[in-house]
Amino acid sequence: MPSGRLVAGINADPIKQLINTHWHFDHTGGNEWVHEAGASILAQENTRKHLLIDTRVEGWKHTFPAAPPGAIPSTVFAEEYTLHANNTTLALKHYLPAHTDSDISVRFVEADVFHTGDTFWNRNYPFVDYSTGGSIDGQIRAAETNIAKVTDKTIVIPGHGAVGDKADLIMFRDVLADAREKVATMKKQGHSLTEVIAKPTARTDEEWGNGFMTPALFLQWVYQGT
């Protein structure tokens, strides 16, 4: 199907601007066909850096090939960027390294909507991309940043999971911090990764471990970063 028809299936109005919240394929995979339909692509500068070259992600045991020219962001920024569209102000802000080194938040100012990208997974364990700057400590730091930026009325859009609110951000931070503390203690006591995977997150596994990030994989990333 032509890209224009695909875009029209999303919105009758033309899409003029596409924002990438970070470089991963599940957040940039539509770049080329949305660009073909007339949109320009905006991202943090590290997103373009990773998309321009073959990028290895050890956590997935996969090397992602460089993106085609039409998928490369044409406008990039370092720390902050403000965009005005449809009578709305969008405030973009780069995080310190968290899920990756390219993560940004997008605040829809007038609507009080806050999009976190993959610095927030609502009731799902997150993937942490150590190969491109991510870490469990960075993910927790970003969670703290997100909590500080919203009110009880803010609508929070995660990178994965259902739309949430401040309480969900707090829960996510607490789950990550609790897992990190338990894993760090076990690692300091000399426990191996295999031993650590034996259920320090059992309390949250039933609800949080049903996404593509299993409890074992999540604990592997936590263990790596402690």
Predicted ranges, named:
Residues V113, D137-H191, E195:
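Divalent-metal (often Zn2+) His-rich catalytic cores of metallo-beta-lactamase-fold enzymes
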Residues K188-T226:
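C-terminal regulatory/interaction regions
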Residues H22, V34, I41, F77, ...:
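Divalent metal-coordination and catalytic microenvironments
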